[in-house]
Amino acid sequence: MLIWLVELANHVQFFNLFRYITFRTGAAMFTAALIVFLFGPKIIASLKVRQGKGQPIRADGPQTHFKKSGTPTMGGLMILAGIVGSSLLWADLSNVYVVATLLVTLGFGAIGFYDDYLKVTKQSDKGFSGKARLAIEFLIAGIAVFFMMEAAKISAPQGPHLATSIAFPFFKDALLNVGYFFIVFGGFVIVSAGNAVNLTDGLDGLAIVPVMIASAAFGLIAYLAGNAVFSGYLQINFVPGTGELAVILGSVIGAGLGFLWFNAPPAAIFMGDTGSLALGGLIGTVAVATKHEIVMVIIGGLFVMETLSVIIQVFWYKRTKKRVFLMAPIHHHFEKKGWTESQVVIRFWIIAVGLAMLGLATLKLR
């Protein structure tokens, strides 16, 4: 919204700063953190009163988790307030990619909120029906992908070909044109990202820091992909307008820092599905917009690892009635093996940093 003040730059030189994505990204980060810091305590107090017993703890989980009983969930509301409030101020709201990303973020956040509500009111880890939840997620993601695809057809130098193509890292101009099937592919990427982050959110601080790391990496990718000079130099696909997504990702980092203040162990609040689904969907949407869906598998490798551990566990148990892991997702497996919660969390953070650096390295490998 404040980008419109650029029109006054001829009269007030300071407003010229609003032209620059880098300035607005930094401002969005600061604003989002400030929003969470200011309103966080009130939101936590309100949720604690309304929820009573807080988020239900899995009976088959590690024994150390039972002391967390009574901790409120739905902390994602704080994160969403920071992201949306900051983005409305600093991002270009006429940008299709910005609107699509906020649509997915709010849509997935609403699904997560309803899921959290059911879990809290029923005091059960069973929330929203899995099939219904996935169907709504795919609908929201599909709408977002369609509009981003149509925007790319008009603005991208390669036009319709790039808009409906899957890009591959390591190879220059390696594109697989799948036509309108790209809506299905893009929707799958976004939904998978949302649920992968959701599965990772099982320990204090475990999900939010890797989300911030991935956001920083994709913030750089968005800025480069939206810049004709930088994308040309790196030989990555130029998608005009995607640079504006760096502003939203800046707000994610700011909101994440604010949330971590309250989520640091012992957590005063959990983000719940409200936050994890929204954040994962947001990152997935940026990956689709910038044509870095496959690179997301590397940068978000920690989330992929968590998801695969669940898939393997369920598949193998159905076939053999035996478990590959002591408990899934895999962070619980390491807890069962004797790692402390802080050991699991910090070591997983280190993995997330390494994977983000590896993912960014692919930008230069052509």
Curated annotation (Swiss-Prot):
Reaction equation(s) it catalyzes: UDP-N-acetyl-alpha-D-muramoyl-L-alanyl-gamma-D-glutamyl-meso-2,6-diaminopimeloyl-D-alanyl-D-alanine + di-trans,octa-cis-undecaprenyl phosphate = di-trans,octa-cis-undecaprenyl diphospho-N-acetyl-alpha-D-muramoyl-L-alanyl-D-glutamyl-meso-2,6-diaminopimeloyl-D-alanyl-D-alanine + UMP
InterPro entries noted in UniProt: Glycosyl_transferase_4 (IPR000715), PNAcMuramoyl-5peptid_Trfase (IPR003524), PNAcMuramoyl-5peptid_Trfase_CS (IPR018480)
GO molecular function: metal ion binding; phospho-N-acetylmuramoyl-pentapeptide-transferase activity; UDP-N-acetylmuramoyl-L-alanyl-D-glutamyl-meso-2,6-diaminopimelyl-D-alanyl-D-alanine:undecaprenyl-phosphate transferase activity
GO CC, one annotated term: plasma membrane
Subcellular location as annotated: Cell inner membrane
Keyword vocabulary terms for this entry: Cell cycle, Cell division, Cell inner membrane, Cell membrane, Cell shape, Cell wall biogenesis/degradation, Magnesium, Membrane, Metal-binding, Peptidoglycan synthesis, Transferase, Transmembrane, Transmembrane helix
Keyword tRNA processing: no
EC number annotated for this UniProt entry: 2.7.8.13
Topological type in the membrane: Multi-pass membrane protein
Cited function: Catalyzes the initial step of the lipid cycle reactions in the biosynthesis of the cell wall peptidoglycan: transfers peptidoglycan precursor phospho-MurNAc-pentapeptide from UDP-MurNAc-pentapeptide onto the lipid carrier undecaprenyl phosphate, yielding undecaprenyl-pyrophosphoryl-MurNAc-pentapeptide, known as lipid I.
Name of the protein in its database record: Phospho-N-acetylmuramoyl-pentapeptide-transferase
